[in-house]
């Protein structure tokens, strides 16, 4: 049973963008729950409110607002300190629950002006577009193709707006998803036949495969159960990958603790009712 197991974790790779690790001695349901928490339950900061004061570009206001919301913002240093806006006592926005951004760009040249994430000015140095994280004071040190394009302006066109970033999680909206991708596998040699290959010899082998070069898949094991899970968690840049993992596990632990507490109250209530 899953609750009787003693899982072990082994990290195989850790970079600024992703973390790879292996969990053993656990259940498929638990492993998939962890994967889902990575995606949907880890809070980050994202733009959620936009007031457009001037927009003469070819894109409607709604297009621009949606693009702004999907720009990843650095959240490592502030997400735990920021309140959810629904829990804040302020009437609209305040430093306790939001971060303000402004953008004011006008094209005065014949050449097309690219409005990008670098044009977003934050009132907090801890929350900036991820692509601006390593930018120096000299603009020549930062190439434009690294920035996220918002809209293109021609001569005489302008875009001026104010926006607020708030704390949220992926279950509310995809813009609060801290991951660019979360993958896990549990049968690298296809011994459980969870996938039927038309031509097994043509399929690329998993990086975790233990087969010899001349083997395409392991012999079928009808009694086998997945107990080892290989994860690859890639961050969108808002949080470091190890922060995503630790925050997700902490959140899952809290959910289980709350469930246990609530269940205990229900049982006690039933006992009192019977008596």
UniProtKB/Swiss-Prot annotation:
Extract one GO molecular function annotation from the record: DNA-directed RNA polymerase activity
Assign the protein's first listed, main location to one coarse class.
nucleus
What the entry lists under SUPFAM superfamilies is as follows: Insert subdomain of RNA polymerase alpha subunit (SSF56553), RBP11-like subunits of RNA polymerase (SSF55257)
The alphabetical list of record keywords is: DNA-directed RNA polymerase, Nucleus, Phosphoprotein, Transcription
User: What's a GO cellular component annotated to this UniProt protein?
Assistant: RNA polymerase II, core complex
**Where found, per UniProt?**
Nucleus
- Among the Pfam families in the record, one is RNA_pol_A_bac
Tell whether Transmembrane helix is among the UniProt keywords.
no
Record-level GO BP terms: transcription by RNA polymerase II
Stretches for region Disordered: 203-226
| Gene3D superfamilies in UniProt | DNA-directed RNA polymerase, insert domain, RNA polymerase, RBP11-like subunit
Residues given in the record as Zn(2+) binding sites: 88, 90, 94, 97
Sequence positions bearing Phosphoserine: 124, 257
The UniProt similarity line reads: Belongs to the archaeal Rpo3/eukaryotic RPB3 RNA polymerase subunit family.
Q: What task does this protein carry out?
A: Core component of RNA polymerase II (Pol II), a DNA-dependent RNA polymerase which synthesizes mRNA precursors and many functional non-coding RNAs using the four ribonucleoside triphosphates as substrates.
PANTHER family (alphabetical): DNA-DIRECTED RNA POLYMERASE (PTHR11800), DNA-DIRECTED RNA POLYMERASE II SUBUNIT RPB3 (PTHR11800:SF2)
Oligomeric state and interaction partners are given as: Component of the RNA polymerase II (Pol II) core complex consisting of 12 subunits: a ten-subunit catalytic core composed of POLR2A/RPB1, POLR2B/RPB2, POLR2C/RPB3, POLR2I/RPB9, POLR2J/RPB11, POLR2E/RPABC1, POLR2F/RPABC2, POLR2H/RPABC3, POLR2K/RPABC4 and POLR2L/RPABC5 and a mobile stalk composed of two subunits POLR2D/RPB4 and POLR2G/RPB7, protruding from the core and functioning primarily in transcription initiation. Part of Pol II(G) complex, in which Pol II core associates with an additional subunit POLR2M; unlike conventional Pol II, Pol II(G) functions as a transcriptional repressor.
Q: What is this protein called?
A: DNA-directed RNA polymerase II subunit RPB3
Q: Which organism is it from?
A: Bos taurus (Bovine)
